[in-house]
């Protein structure tokens, strides 16, 4: 399934769509908001407002690890000590309400925030989106203070003993490697590693620098529950394919692979798949999403050619973020599968209760060969989430494409805590 490089406009849509693709609604602030860690290493949502008058405020911007991309709906708050670390490996990140004595706010679509302060002296400023979290000591005084970007930039890797005080945490991620959809390069461009020239000058990651694991033997990984449980996010991009076949989808039909992926997500893991790897969503979780052309045969929904389409961001938070980074004309480019529709199904929530799960459509391609159809969808399964996009990131140069920025948005959204409310 050889692909051409995507154009920036189309890339933007892909990223933006996927970016919003996962997360649970919160009754605090914007529904796309993530949380922040608590004493048990879990995640907080803001509580009720303070009853005191503030003595001042802290203002700044929340940025991606690479230092320029704004992060919307990140939780920002002040506490007396850094939050306890997240648990190692997969865990059920349930939202907990911050005590009303804790000053907190969310960043806007352009990443800016203004946080009220109620006490003077040394405190810790915490910035978190999903399981990306940074805490830094700060001396709070009366009046308005501007916070340096370095204190509110999401961390590029884990460090629980930052010189000068504070902590950095990121989710543990695994990328299944292959021929196509080099998500690892996009992750590196977003600040999670370094890239170097590869064959014919096409960029590749410098594996000695990356903050995630690359899985070169998926057949020995995807059916291994113990191996999967070491991670918070697993990427299965359109990677294994050769030519225009779906031969690499076959591992998804293995009962041990299906069971391992189901258990990983139910325990709190996040699974991200793209186009020809759609079977890794369809086989473990049948019926939530229907694809055009699908039959009982593995790979039946794979198309022999690609298509581009103008698109629409269905989610208001995603649309606002795209506008904030200057993207107005959405497109999905190099789609190799087409979603027909999503379906409500009976499933389990994070506590094992039987619920109706309705997949969320984040982006719609408006002009597919079958008309307007979903392009990025997600749903919750147990305590985790599953995300799929009909297109993928194409990393053919050293520049940071809009779709690669959207990939960051995806990472953050799939890692937010789960609530009692409807899945997103």
Indicate residue ranges for each PLM-predicted region.
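A short, solvent-exposed beta-strand micro-motif common in secreted/extracellular proteins
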Residues: 76-78, 111-114, 120-137
């Amino acid at each position: 399934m050889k692909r051409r490089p995507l154009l920036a406009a189309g890339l933007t849509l892909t990223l933006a769509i996927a970016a919003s693709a996962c997360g649970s609604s919160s009754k605090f602030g914007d529904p796309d908001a993530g949380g922040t860690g608590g004493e048990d290493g879990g995640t907080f949502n803001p509580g009720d407002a303070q009853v005191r008058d503030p003595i001042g405020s802290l203002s700044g911007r929340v940025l991606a690890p690479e230092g320029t991309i704004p992060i919307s709906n990140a939780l920002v708050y002040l506490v007396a000590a850094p939050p306890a670390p997240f648990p190692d490996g997969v865990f059920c990140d349930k939202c907990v309400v911050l005590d009303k004595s804790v000053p907190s706010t969310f960043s806007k679509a352009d990443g800016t925030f203004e946080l009220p302060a109620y006490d003077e002296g040394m405190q810790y400023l915490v910035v978190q989106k999903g399981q990306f979290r940074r805490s830094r000591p700060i001396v709070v005084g009366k009046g308005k203070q501007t916070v340096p970007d370095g204190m509110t930039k999401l961390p590029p890797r884990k460090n629980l003993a930052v010189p000068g005080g504070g902590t950095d945490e990121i989710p543990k991620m695994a990328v299944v490697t292959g021929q196509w959809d080099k998500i690892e390069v996009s992750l590196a461009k977003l600040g999670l590693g370094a890239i170097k020239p590869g064959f014919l000058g096409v960029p590749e990651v410098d594996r000695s620098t990356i903050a995630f694991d690359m899985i070169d033997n998926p057949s020995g990984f995807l059916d291994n529950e113990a191996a999967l449980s070491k991670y918070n996010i697993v990427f299965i991009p359109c990677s294994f394919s050769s030519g225009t076949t779906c031969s690499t989808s076959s591992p998804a039909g293995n009962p041990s692979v299906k069971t391992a992926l189901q258990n990983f997500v139910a325990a709190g893991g996040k699974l991200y798949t793209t186009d020809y790897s759609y079977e890794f969503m369809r086989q473990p979780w049948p019926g939530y999403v229907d694809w055009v052309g699908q039959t009982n045969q593995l790979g039946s929904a794979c198309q022999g050619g690609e298509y581009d389409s103008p698109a629409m961001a269905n989610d208001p938070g995603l649309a606002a973020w795209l506008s904030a980074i200057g993207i107005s004309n959405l497109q999905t480019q190099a789609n190799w599968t087409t979603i027909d529709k999503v379906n409500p199904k009976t499933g389990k929530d994070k506590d094992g209760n039987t619920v109706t799960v309705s997949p969320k459509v984040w982006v719609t391609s408006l002009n597919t060969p079958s008309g307007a159809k979903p392009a990025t969808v997600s749903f919750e399964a147990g305590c985790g989430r599953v995300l799929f996009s009909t297109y993928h990131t194409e990393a053919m140069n050293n520049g940071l494409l809009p779709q690669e920025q959207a990939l960051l948005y995806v990472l953050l959204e799939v890692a937010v805590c789960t609530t009692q409310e409807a899945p997103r």
